[in-house]
Every structure is written in structure tokens, then in C-alpha cells.
Amino acid sequence: MKNTILILFTAFIALLGFFGMSAEALADPVADPLAGPNAEADPEAINWKGIAAMAKKLLG
């Protein structure tokens, strides 16, 4: 029984890592999942909204 729980827990953590869940996302379940990346939580995150706004501005 203990081994089964350990295996399931390990598989759960592996799936979270596979799908790119961060510790910040798990720690804050109230956060809006459709919001852009939090620059404070991940300084290397790509700011897609900023890139889209700049492309729209450049292309007219």
C-alpha cells in the first residue's frame, strides 16, 4: 500500500513537470489561468501580450 501511494505521488509530480506546471501556479490556485506570465515569478517568461501589441503597432 505504501509503495502504491509513493508510485502514484511520483507519477503525479512527473506529470506536473511534463506539462510545465510551476510551483507558483500550484501555490496560487486563485490566479487567472488565462492571464499572461507573471514577470516577477519568472523573469525569463515570454511576454506574448507585449510581443503581440508591438507586432500590431509595427504592422498597422
UniProtKB/Swiss-Prot annotation:
Modified residues (Leucine amide): 59
Tissues and organs where the protein is expressed, per its UniProt entry: Expressed by the venom gland.
Propeptide residues per the UniProt entry: 28-45
GO-annotated cellular components: extracellular region; membrane; other organism cell membrane
Segments annotated as AXPX repeats: 27-30, 31-34, 35-38, 41-44
Leader sequence segment: 1-27
One Gene Ontology term from the biological process aspect of the record: innate immune response
Compartments where located: Secreted; Target cell membrane
UniProt KW keywords: Amidation, Antibiotic, Antimicrobial, G-protein coupled receptor impairing toxin, Immunity, Innate immunity, Mast cell degranulation, Membrane, Repeat, Secreted, Signal, Target cell membrane, Target membrane, Toxin
Single Gene Ontology MF annotation: toxin activity
Matching Pfam families: Mastoparan (PF08249)
Function: Antimicrobial and mast cell degranulating peptide. Has broad spectrum antibacterial activity against both Gram-positive and Gram-negative bacteria (S.aureus MIC=32-64 ug/ml, S.xylosus MIC=3 ug/ml, S.alactolyticus MIC=16 ug/ml, C.koseri MIC=4 ug/ml, E.coli MIC=8 ug/ml, K.pneumoniae MIC=64 ug/ml, P.aerugiosa MIC=256 ug/ml, S.choleraesuis MIC=32 ug/ml, S.typhimurium MIC=32 ug/ml, V.parahamelytics MIC=32 ug/ml). Affects membrane permeability of E.coli. Shows hemolytic activities on sheep, chicken and human erythrocytes.
Family statement: Belongs to the MCD family. Mastoparan subfamily.
Protein's name in the database: Mastoparan-V
Organism in which the protein naturally occurs: Vespa velutina flavitarsus
